[in-house]
From Swiss-Prot:
Gene3D superfamilies: Leucine-rich Repeat Variant, Scaffold protein Nfu/NifU, N-terminal domain. Required for hemolysin production. SUPFAM superfamilies: ARM repeat (SSF48371), Hypothetical protein SAV1430 (SSF110836). The lineage of its organism: Bacteria, Bacillati, Bacillota, Bacilli, Bacillales. This is Conserved virulence factor C. One of its GO terms (molecular function) is oxidoreductase activity. Belongs to the CvfC family. Keywords: Virulence. The keyword Coiled coil does not apply. The keyword Nucleotide-binding does not apply. It comes from the Bacteria. It comes from Staphylococcus aureus (strain MRSA252). Transmembrane segments: none annotated.
Length: 374
């Protein structure tokens, strides 16, 4: 058994260690102290100074450390527990950092288009929250005696969020209640009871003009417009540019998401506005969009993000430079080699190593998949 990769998680005190071995019993265990009946490698890890607990399931471990402990001291000992060496894994490869550091996936559970529960999933945690009771009541009203709610319910992908998972839940709840106001629930029930509800995209995709958007005073209505917006085109840029100046973070974030759908270098200046937003969630979302587009022209702007106060943003910048960078970015990378966030430091080291070794910049995983299909 050996380590395949080590991935950071949204918690600064937890690392995910992916193993070459998968448990056959499909069970999970949490270990907090050394005991004779535990696997030997678990006891070895628990003996490492600074490790407080280990969660083992399937093919990975979630290793927790004490808040004052340093990952830079702990990780060599974790490697040694599997390889017998302090610096090199048995596979001869350095651990690879995850492509989704800091992401929290947000999903909305719906039945016939009526929402009633939110789920957030991070690398090591899941959090659910039911919408107010009136949403559950209206969802129940939409059922008929022939409906099977288990088979008919659907999870809608709300995209990724960043930050403390409890705070993210508060923000997503606010967004959902704005997108699906209580006043619309009776209409949604009426629509759900119609036979063609499954194929009718009622009230979901509706294009709005710049004038209509500009005349809307309520931020919840503006957010609802953007959430129900069809795939944008160049003609929609003025509207989305206006939304980038909105006082509400969810509106600005959704504007960035929509701008990222316009797959052109001409959209980069607008995404750069997102990189300078006062909200780290908007800055990270803009960085993700730029990473997905994979235009090397964005390198100068992403290099500036290595000085961002938020590590989730600095990490995205370092990851983009790893994906797209060249020797021109080496001075900036080396100037930030001692980043105080271990995950960022590790990604910077990987970028430096890739460039100095002369390895080709392959681009993001998404870009590689796209190129492979051409």
């Amino acid at each position: 058994m050996e380590i395949l990769r080590i991935e950071p998680t949204p918690s600064p005190n937890t690392m995910k260690v992916v193993l070459s071995y998968t448990r056959e019993d499909k069970l999970s265990n949490t270990y907090k102290k050394v005991e004779e009946n535990q696997p030997r490698f678990i006891n070895q890890l628990l003996s490492i100074d600074g490790i407080t607990s280990i969660f083992h399931v399937m093919n990975f471990l979630a290793v927790d450390k004490a808040p004052k402990a340093d990952w830079e001291d702990i990780l060599p000992d974790i490697k040694a527990a599997f390889s017998g060496e302090s610096q090199v894994l048995e596979s001869g490869k350095d651990p690879q950092i995850d492509n989704h550091f800091g992401e929290i996936k947000a999903e909305l559970l719906t039945f016939k288009g009526i929402p009633y529960q939110i789920k957030l999933t991070s690398a090591d945690q899941e959090l659910r929250e039911q919408l107010p009771q009136t949403y559950v009541d209206h969802m129940t009203q939409a059922q008929t005696k022939h409906d099977n709610i288990v088979f008919m319910r659907k999870w809608l992908d709300l995209g990724n969020r960043y930050g403390n998972i409890e705070e993210v839940m508060d923000g997503v709840l606010e967004e959902v209640l704005a997108t699906y106001p209580e006043s619309q629930l009776p209409v949604l029930v009426k629509h759900a009871l119609e036979e063609n509800h499954a194929t009718n995209n009622y009230h979901f995709y509706r294009h709005v003009s710049l004038d209509e958007y500009h005349a809307t005073d309520n931020w919840k209505t503006r957010l609802r417009m953007l959430n129900h917006f069809p795939k944008p085109t160049f003609e929609d840029i003025p509207l989305l540019d206006l939304a980038l100046s909105d006082e509400k973070v969810p509106v600005r974030r959704q504007a960035i998401v929509l701008l990222g759908m316009i797959e052109s270098k001409e959209i980069l200046p607008y995404l750069y506005k997102g990189l300078r937003d006062k909200s780290p969630a908007v800055r990270r979302t803009a960085g993700d969009c730029i990473s997905d587009l994979g235009y090397p022209e964005a390198l100068p702007e992403m290099v500036l993000l290595l000085d961002d106060p938020q590590k989730i943003v600095r990490w995205r910048a370092a990851m983009f430079i790893f994906d797209e960078g060249n020797a021109e970015q080496l001075p900036a990378l080396k100037a930030h080699i001692n980043d105080n966030a271990f995950e960022v430091k590790l990604q910077i080291e990987m970028a430096i190593s890739r460039i100095e070794n002369g390895d080709e910049a392959l681009g993001s995983v998404w870009k590689q998949m796209t190129n492979r299909t051409i």
